[in-house]
């Protein structure tokens, strides 16, 4: 996956042949919530497509925690009981997968974690999209746009999810020492519907706002729709690299940034599992901290032939993309 590199300064590696096994392989995945939002749905599809494309993987078992910590604990136990050859985990919370990770490692099963940090470091490989970087890049955009002062709204994702926690932390770091104040904050759950409700509530309570920071997913597009619904100008806003947001941005020309957090991380985790089972030596920790997209890049990558639910970057084939998101 472009942009994924070994975490700077971290020299821990997984030795060659430590988890080497003859194929065919059975790989399991504990997903935090496939239906949480359109990004989570596509990340699952990216994972499944990557597994399907490798003939050495005979079975890919994806279990959906549906945002339940208790369900994730049970799912990981289930995958261990099924004697899968590797487990991929996207944690519901910073601690929801810790016990399961340690159980799997003790059973000799390598564990790949992505899309959220864990308290434990017993995992085999960690691939993180840099939540703090996401929040900081988008926060710094607002600092620059507002000249270091003004009132902003904050739309959180899932406040207990490690990715949202770190994105918010990055925002706070970006506005530290400035005269930017958070005057309204609530959780839009990374969804269009909840994001719309939160933004409309903010607007009706006090429409005077200088900028909007969003934790991403479908909330930014929803907030733009609220302003357009009331015939008001959209203030500087942060978004994510989603086809729907890019379309709104291009059509409106609003001052914005799209921060990248590709669902291709799902495929990257499958490739990491394959590398381990194939006996390759790889790093323990990887990081993915791309720059934000400007309007020029948005125009160059927007896909008018695909729906607003499509996220970038993606490793899905064009045939798969059109089957899933074609208009």
What are these regions (language model features)?
Residues 1-327:
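A residue-level marker of the well-folded mature domains of exported/periplasmic proteins
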